[in-house]
Amino acid sequence: MINLIEIRRQLHQIPEIGLEEHKTQKYLLTIIHQIIQNKSFIQVETWQTGLLVYLKGSQGQKTIGWRTDIDGLPVEELTNLPFASKNGRMHACGHDIHMTVALGLLEKLSESQPKNNLLFLFQPAEENEAGGKLMYDGGAFKNWLPDEFYGLHVRPDLKVGDIATNEQTLFAGTCEVELTFVGTGGHAAFPHTANDALVAAAYFVTQVQTIVSRNVDPLDSAVVTFGKMEAGTTNNIIAERAFLHGTIRSLTQEVNELTQKRLTELAKGVAQSFDMTIDLKLKQGGYLPVENNPKLAKELMDFFRNETKANLIDIAPAMTGEDFGYLLSKIPGVMFWLGINSEAPLHSQKMQADEGVLDFAVEAIGQFLDIKANRN
């Protein structure tokens, strides 16, 4: 039997950025081969730094998928844990917990050959490159494409035993925005001979806020945030270029596309009014809204509602993004939050998970997947 806490701590020490998860993949393969030895009904495939583990069912009428992400973040860990990472990277989003739970589920569900097929997906690059989309579009699933897909994300402000989801949209769709205004630089004393890109960018940032207040239905949800601005070199030089880096978030793809459209129109309009040019990049890629399948979500929620050790919460959507949304746009499935009882939030340098979640998750989720895997 694998040691979940030891595995989690080993994974916690080797976080890697998306599509660079070579040590992570090697470690996962070591544990997976321990689990599946002498089990001829299991196959393993690699895809770049990702992994697929396929359990062929004795009847194989359908394939049930379980997805976990495996990448870390470019964050310096400040937890002071004895097993803290020391490479300027950190599993600050809890993907070490995700992977460990997946390995525990694989061990539990491979004790005997299931009736239905099972696919365990260890997906790279959730944080930066929408690895789920890359794998799907790249043909990684081959003949193993699931009929139903399930996955989780840890949530610090929920307690161990809490499972939270809903029958609709769980996470927002996101779109990264990169916008550069290009004017004409000059001396601060002679603004009439220059064309100030900083002023244009600042004007745009204030105007873009009207998209949510005046173009989006008040009953819908959207966020437009610019968190980074770079312009100029010193106090007495008018900036020739101004760069803005932001994000669009919405609970439906329709609203996201509307917001992208209006942002583009505003950027072009501001550029024209200031007699400038712009370079605009909108990068949504695979970060679509995470839309749960209502029927499958109800089934999962009913199961955990009746589990004595689980506390099922019907939770409102969150504006966080997740590339599992792309896979769920292709395959019906469900994502849910898993409580880990951490005082520090996701992406924090001090985020710590209660390791008691490991045994709970493997036992509770394992029972649910066992029913799915062995249902006629």
Curated annotation (Swiss-Prot):
GO biological process: diaminopimelate biosynthetic process; lysine biosynthetic process via diaminopimelate
Catalysed reactions listed for this entry: N-acetyl-(2S,6S)-2,6-diaminopimelate + H2O = (2S,6S)-2,6-diaminopimelate + acetate
Pathway: Amino-acid biosynthesis; L-lysine biosynthesis via DAP pathway; LL-2,6-diaminopimelate from (S)-tetrahydrodipicolinate (acetylase route): step 3/3
GO molecular function (one): N-acetyldiaminopimelate deacetylase activity
EC code(s) of this entry: 3.5.1.47
Chain's role: Catalyzes the conversion of N-acetyl-diaminopimelate to diaminopimelate and acetate.
Cited NCBIfam families: amidohydrolases
HAMAP family associated with the record: DapEL (MF_01692)
Protein name: N-acetyldiaminopimelate deacetylase
